[in-house]
Structures are given as structure tokens and as C-alpha cells.
Regions:
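Loop/turn-rich, solvent-exposed surfaces of beta-rich toroidal or solenoidal domains
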Residues: 352-356, 361-372, 376-378, 393, ...
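Beta-propeller blade signature
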Residues: 86-88, 134-143, 193-204, 249-266, ...
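Blade-loop segments of beta-propeller domains
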Residues: 54-55, 93-130, 150-162, 212-222, ...
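Short beta-strand elements that form the blades of beta-propeller/WD-repeat-like
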Residues: 63, 67-77, 117-129, 175-188, ...
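Structural signature of eukaryotic scaffold interfaces centered on beta-propeller domains
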Residues: 59-67, 111-116, 164-176, 223-230, ...
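Bacterial Sec-dependent N-terminal signal peptides
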Residues: 1-48
Length: 525
């Protein structure tokens, strides 16, 4: 079975939107892919690529690890060319490279995915004459040659050039199909449909549908999508809260529903997945190996941005009935571990990852994020100055069985804040394998030793200094946590980049660091 690998590993602020593709395109374990610079970084790092230093023409770097033992690195450059480099995952030695030029002028790369050694790229182009956004796709061999020609695959009429196209792409788990559609920042009207076009790997269109959802008292704004192996599509309402630059966050409201559309029988089915007396804060959904849909996330008892527990809903395959629907509150002991005595809920936690294991177990990973303000007054002028701090703190993990019960819950202490909301070195990277789970992040060097003392439960604060370490936290399948220092960031004056998360074969963990227009990949011993 061919498996597509999609990745958005960026040196700076993300331009593309690949994160939603990861959960639908992988059937294997996630791995951390990061950037680094020297073979002398740490005894835990051994093999490194040759890398790039101070290349001013380098815009972004994206990478992917494949089943056939290759690490694919794609460099986007200012001249519009893409450099495709291939390395052996075992030794990280270069085994090939090619240069890909855009097939036409004014194309904007929106998405790409890799199946075996064929790279499929999806572009958008603003058509000023026709007042529309045109979408094209092209396939390239590993030698950089264009397969066939540039294909026109979608379009959307516009009232003026949009700030961004809103083009989205979802792959089936077996990577034999992908669907294109537009999901813009502006909420849809009741009468507005969603225009889907589904293709196979050869860019042959399988079906097309302008899907209009059933009328409802409240308009269901759909922002979650899944494509199953048969080519049918699932949709789910609700836009999850994001870690925004604002210091105020409003939880979701309104009707919460999921839909199933079979393009071959034209059947549209609706599922009500809301909680009657509770507030759904954030959810994700994914397909398991049986093609069942797993919906899981956080809920609140008080209709504020405070998490009270987890919810789990399982839909039978191919638009079947609801197999399981339940919610589970956090235990008092876990809330005390996270927040201390006297608390009943967890504040400011955002759902980042939903992992569905082969055993049917579901793992939810969320991070505590909030914006704080500090106001100071200049004693001479009386002028007030406001400092905003963007805080990335503890991470929590919950493992749920198929009955929605918590098998284990883990707190991973972490404290970070930055004054720059566009700094890519904050937060964390998550990976899953058959052996368990791993979280990697930049950390103060005193944290590991400090947390080894059972009397101290707070990590030391890291604020962006390169006099720091990269911490690796491992969680076993039974919920046992261990914390080690992966490498000392001081040696090369570089920082771990958490945006660089990808999928690949179990057993190949590749790490690294980035700084401006420089990068390098390394893997552990």
C-alpha cells in the first residue's frame, strides 16, 4: 500500500497550511523532524545531513520521511524554484537531488504530497480577467521531470482578489485519492454550498459535487473534513479555538454536527454530536484502521474557556450508526496535579493532537496557552507601556479506551513565554510510535534536574535564550513519563523548531534546529 507523506517544516512563519493533512494521510507513527547543525551537538545525535548555512535565497524548508527509507527535503527559494533533496534515513547521506521550476508564472504553491517517489503539487493562480481563483496540479518524478502536463483541477469565482485562496486538500488514509475544496476565513451563508472535487493519484477526476447542507435554525459552519478510502467524505462543524495573538478567546457555540456524504449514491447523513448541557470546546476527528470515524476532544461544564473533561464519539464505517458516544470528566486528582487544590476545571487548554492507535485507544494532547499583559509607567513622562507575553505552558495527555474511560493521564511540565507572536521556536512537537509517545521542546537547562525533585512540580521558565537545552519527554503506552535532555543548544547557538513534525517509519527519529536561512537534519544514535 502506498502511503503519502505530507509536511510543513518552516524556518519562519507558516505560509502553507499542511497541518490538517497530517492526520488524514498517515497510517504510521509520527516522527519529530527538526533542524540541526553539527555532529558535535550531543552524544544522543549521530548522523547529520550536510545542511545549508546562511543561504539568503532560501525561503522555506519542508521535509518528509518515507517508508522506503528516504528523507525528502524540499527547499523553496526566492526565485520560485524548488530544490528536492533526498537522503538515506539510516546515514542521512545525500542520495539524489533535483530542481523543480513552477510550470507557469504567478502560481502560488498551496499543498504538496509525496506518494512513493512521485511529488504532487497543487497551485492556485489569480485570474484577474475572469475574477476567479484557478487551481492547478502537477506531478513530478524524483528527477524533477513533469509527468504529463499541468492539470486544471478546480476554480472559484471571487468578488475581488482574496487575501488567501482558502484552498484545502484532504487525502484518503491509503493515499489513493485526494479531495480539493475551498474553506475561507469568512463564514458561509445558509444558501452557500461547498464545492468538492475528488481525484486519484493520476489526477483523474473521480467525482464532483456542490454540496449544500440541510437547513437548520443555526447555520452549521463546517471546518473539519475527512476523506475515507472509498472516496466518501465526512464533514464536522465547529472551528476550534486557536492560539491567537489576542488576549481574549471566545469558546464555540451553536449546533455541533457531523455529516457523511457518499458521492456514488448521493446519500447525505447527519449526526448530532453536541452535548445537551455542556459546551464542546474543541474536537478533532480521524479514521481508524476499520474506517470508523473517531471524534474526540474537550468539553466544558460552565460554557467558558475551561476544560472539564473529554468526549469520545465513534461512528461506524461508511456512514453507519453512532457506535459510541460518551464524555468523561477529569478526576479530582488529575485536576489537582495540573492546577493545585481548589480547582474544578483546567483553564486555557487547547487541543493540538488526536492520535488513534491500532488497538483502538485514543490519545489527546493539549497545551496550556494564554496571553498576559504587563503595564508599566515611565516615571519621567508618565507614558504607559504595555507588554504582551505569549505563554506556552504545561502539556497534558489523556489515553482513552473504546468505552471513553481514561486509562491514564499525564502532565508534562513546561514553561515558555515570548514577546514575539511569530517566533517559531515555542510550543512543542508531538510524535507517536508503537513504543509510545514523545514530546520535544526548547527548555531551560535547570528544568530536568529541578523536576527530578518530587517536591518541585514547576518547570523553569524559558524565554527564547539560546543558552538552553532541547528536552525530550517520553510517555510509554502505559502512561509512564521520563524526561531527558536531548541536546545543549548553547554549542551551536541554535534552537529547536517545533513546527517540524512529520510522519515516517518507526525507529528513525530525526531531530534538529533552525536559525533564519540555515538548516540541517540529524538523527539519534
Amino acid at each position: 500500500m502506498a502511503t503519502a507523506w505530507i509536511f510543513s517544516a518552516l524556518l519562519r512563519v507558516p505560509k502553507y497550511h499542511f497541518n490538517h493533512l497530517l492526520s488524514t494521510a498517515v497510517s504510521w507513527a509520527l516522527l519529530c523532524l527538526c533542524l540541526c547543525f553539527s555532529e558535535t551537538l550531543s552524544s544522543q545525535l549521530r548522523y547529520c545531513t550536510s545542511g545549508v548555512k546562511n543561504d539568503r535565497s532560501l525561503e522555506r524548508v519542508q521535509a518528509v520521511a518515507s517508508k522506503n527509507g528516504k528523507l525528502h527535503v524540499i527547499e523553496e527559494r526566492q526565485d520560485g524554484e524548488l530544490h528536492w533533496l533526498r537522503y538515506s534515513l539510516d546515514s542521512l547521506k545525500e542520495i539524489g537531488n533535483s530542481t523543480i521550476s513552477f510550470p507557469a508564472n504567478d502560481l502560488v504553491l498551496e499543498h504538496f504530497f509525496l506518494v512513493n517517489d512521485t511529488l504532487t503539487m497543487v497551485y492556485s493562480q489569480w485570474n484577474k480577467t475572469a475574477e476567479r481563483t484557478d487551481v492547478f496540479a502537477a506531478c513530478f518524478t524524483e528527477f524533477g521531470s513533469l509527468v504529463d502536463s499541468l492539470h486544471s483541477v478546480h476554480m472559484r469565482p471571487e468578488n475581488g482578489k482574496p487575501r488567501r485562496s482558502g484552498l484545502q486538500c484532504e487525502l484518503s488514509p491509503d493515499s489513493t485519492k485526494f479531495v480539493l475544496f475551498f474553506d475561507g476565513e469568512v463564514e458561509r451563508k445558509q444558501s452557500e454550498g461547498i464545492h468538492f472535487r475528488c481525484f486519484n493519484r493520476s489526477l483523474k477526476q473521480l467525482w464532483e459535487k456542490e454540496l449544500r447542507l440541510p437547513p437548520a435554525v443555526e447555520i452549521a459552519q463546517v471546518h473539519h473534513y475527512l476523506l475515507d478510502n472509498s472516496g466518501a467524505i465526512y464533514l464536522m462543524s465547529g472551528r476550534n479555538p486557536i492560539k491567537s495573538f489576542s488576549d481574549w478567546q471566545r469558546p464555540q457555540g451553536g449546533q455541533y454536527v457531523a455529516y457523511y456524504f457518499d458521492p456514488y449514491t448521493k446519500r447525505l447523513k447527519q449526526y448530532d454530536i453536541g452535548l445537551k448541557d455542556k459546551q464542546v470546546l474543541s474536537t478533532e476527528f480521524a479514521l481508524n484502521d476499520k474506517q470508523e470515524v473517531v471524534i474526540a476532544g474537550y468539553y466544558s461544564n460552565n460554557f467558558k474557556f475551561r476544560v472539564s473533561g473529554t468526549l469520545l464519539i465513534i461512528l461506524n464505517a461508511h456512514g453507519g450508526s453512532i457506535k459510541k458516544a460518551a464524555y468523561t470528566p477529569f478526576s479530582e486528582a488529575f485536576i489537582t496535579t495540573m492546577e493545585g487544590d481548589g480547582k474544578e476545571t483546567l483553564e486555557d487548554f487547547y487541543l493540538d493532537h488526536l492520535h488513534v492507535g491500532d488497538s483502538g485507544r485514543v490519545v489527546l494532547v493539549g497545551e496550556q496557552y494564554y496571553v498576559s499583559r504587563f503595564v508599566s509607567t515611565d516615571p519621567t513622562t508618565g507614558r504607559q507601556m504595555v507588554e504582551y507575553r505569549y505563554n506556552f505552558d504545561d502539556v497534558m495527555m489523556h489515553c482513552l479506551d473504546t468505552a471513553a474511560e481514561h486509562l491514564w493521564s499525564v502532565r508534562i511540565p513546561k514553561r515558555q513565554f515570548t514577546n514575539s507572536p511569530t517566533d517559531v521556536h515555542f510550543s512543542y512537537a508531538f510524535a507517536a510510535s508503537n513504543e509510545g509517545f514523545a514530546l520535544t521542546f526548547n527548555d531551560d537547562e535547570a528544568s530536568t534536574e529541578r523536576l527530578a525533585n518530587d517536591d518541585d512540580t514547576q518547570a523553569s521558565l524559558w524565554t527564547g535564550s539560546k543558552n538552553s537545552v532541547t528536552t525530550l519527554c517520553r510517555v510509554t503506552n502505559t502512561g509512564q513519563l521520563s524526561r531527558t535532555t536531548l541536546t545543549d543548544n548553547t554549542t551551536e547557538r541554535l534552537l529547536f523548531n517545533p513546527l517540524m513534525t512529520t510522519s515516517g517509519p518507526v525507529g528513525h527519529s530525526v531531530f534538529g534546529f533552525s536559525d533564519s536561512r540555515s538548516y540541517k537534519f540529524c538523527r539519534r544514535r
